[in-house]
Amino acid sequence: DARLRTDFNITTGIKSAEIEKFKRKSVMKTYYQKAGIPTARWCVTADVTEAQAFAKTVGWPVIAKPDNGVGANGTHKFKNKTELNKFFQQEGPNAANYILEEFVDGEIVTFDGVADANAEPIYAASHVTPDSIMEIAHGKKPMWYYVAPEISPELRKMGEAALKAFGAKSRFFHLEFFRLKTAKPSLGNAGDILGLEVNMRPAGGYTVDMLNYAGGLDLYQIWADMVAFGAAHHPLARYHRYCCCAGRHDELRYRIPHEELLKKYRSCLNAAPRLPEVLAREMGDQLYIASFEDEAAMQAFRRDALARLRE
C-alpha cells in the first residue's frame, strides 16, 4: 500500500520512503527507543571480532536474525564462541544482513488492531505466545498461543507510544513485545515489557479470526470503516473472551484422539483447520481454535489438545 500511495500521491498513510522503519529490525529498535520503550541490546556487523565482543558483553546465548525478515525464518541461537564463529565463516560478508541480539527469556505479547489517521488505535487487542517462536518453528515446542480478554495498562501505554513513534497512521498494526519470565540486570525484572518487532499489517495465520472470535467483532470491517470514514461504524468488542490455538503433528500420538477432542469441545471450538505442508512443519498439521470465558477452562483444553501418549 505504501507503493500505491507513492505512485498516486495519496497522503493518508505511509509512503515508500518511510517503509524502512517497518522492514529492518535494527531500525525498529531506534523507534522503540524513541517511544521510551526498552529493547534487548543488539548490533549489526560482518566482523566476527566485533560479534565476539558483543557476545562477551551481553553473555551467551546470542540470537541472530535476518535484519530484513519475518517470523522465525533464518533465526539462529549461538550457545558459544565456536557456534558464532562457524556462522560468520559460513555467511561471510552476508553476516552484515543479520542483527545480533542478546537472548531474552520471555513470552511474546502483542498489541494488535487498527489505527486511525492520527496513529491512535480505533480498536486494539493482544495475544500471548508463552513459548519461544524459534522453538515452535524448529519443532521443539507445540504450537500454542491465545488472545487475552484484556490488555494490561502497561502494554497499552507502550503500544500506543509505539504507534505514535512509528507514525502508524490509517492501517493495521501488529506490534510485538517481550514480557520477561525471569529478571536480568541489563533488561529488567520478571514481568517487565521490552520492544521486539513491529509489523504494519494484520497478524498472521488465523490470528485475525481469533481476535474476532474473542471479541465478537469483524476486524476487517473495522479496517474498512477506517478507510472509508476514519472511525468504526460497526460494533467493537461485544464481549471479552480467551481464544486459543493449539497445533498437532500427524506423526505424533496424542492421548485424546482427534474425533474425541472435537466431540468433547464441540460447544467451544470455532474451527479445526488442516494446514498445508508448507506451514505444517512449524505449526502442526491440525489446528484447533477454541474460545473460553475463563483461563482455567482454556488451560484444560490446552492439556487435552496437546497431551501425548507415552511411547
Go through each PLM region and give its residues.
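Alpha-helix N-cap recognition
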Residues: 47, 78-82, 257, 294
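Short glycine-/acidic-enriched loop or helix-start segments at secondary-structure transitions
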Residues: 1-3, 73-74, 207
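Conserved ATP-binding module of the ATP-grasp superfamily
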Residues: 38-40, 57, 61-64, 75-110, ...
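A short, GP-enriched loop/loop-strand-helix hinge that lies immediately N-terminal to
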Residues: 1-24, 36-44
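Structural element of the ATP-grasp superfamily
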Residues: 28-33
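Short glycine-enriched loop/turn motifs at secondary-structure junctions
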Residues: 36-38, 68-72, 281-284
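ATP-dependent carboxylate/phosphate-activation module, predominantly the ATP-grasp catalytic core
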Residues: 102-168, 172, 179, 183, ...
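Peripheral (often C-terminal) accessory segments that flank ATP-dependent C-N-forming ligase machineries
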Residues: 222-311
